[in-house]
Amino acid sequence: MGHNGGVANHAGVAGAAAAAGLKSAAGLGVVGVSLSGLYAITGIGIPCPWRLLTGTLCPFCGATNMGAALLRGDLDAAWAANPFVLTALSGLTLACIFWVVELLGGTAVRLPRRLSDQRIWYIALAAAGIAFALWRNLLPAA
């Protein structure tokens, strides 16, 4: 096909990427809400293998408490439980909003080309997680 076929095909690929992102986020959301709800009801959480082995908190320790606090609508308690995961969740929520707008026919929001490589985001997220783990384990509680 001509130019229009390429544009339509590109739009279909972009829409497929948005749908795939939403599908992944929905799966993560179902698991997170389920585990947080179970913890809120029963008090039974997930033991952290890292904490069991080292006695230190991993970047995700407190995420179940954070989720339970969000289910109660207590943003302060959610932040106190795990600000790293809460911040990452906020970013994921923003991405989901953009994907829904795109799937409903709105403008697709894209990062600048220099920031579009997923490896950059994986490295940045890992570095932030390590920095957060060091901060929460090495600095005295205020």
Model-found features: residue ranges?
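N-terminal pre-ligand scaffold of iron-sulfur
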Residues: 2-52
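Juxtamembrane/interfacial segments flanking transmembrane helices
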Residues: 44-50, 103-110, 142
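Iron-sulfur (Fe-S) cluster-binding segments and ferredoxin-like electron-carrier domains
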Residues: 45-81
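Alpha-helical transmembrane segments and their immediate interhelical/interface regions
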Residues: 1-15, 92-100, 134, 141
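Short Fe-S-cluster ligation motifs
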Residues: 16-35, 82-110
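Juxtamembrane boundary at the C-terminal end of a transmembrane helix
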Residues: 42, 131-142
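Alpha-helical membrane-inserting segments
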Residues: 38, 67, 71, 97, ...
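Interfacial loop-to-transmembrane junctions
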Residues: 109-128
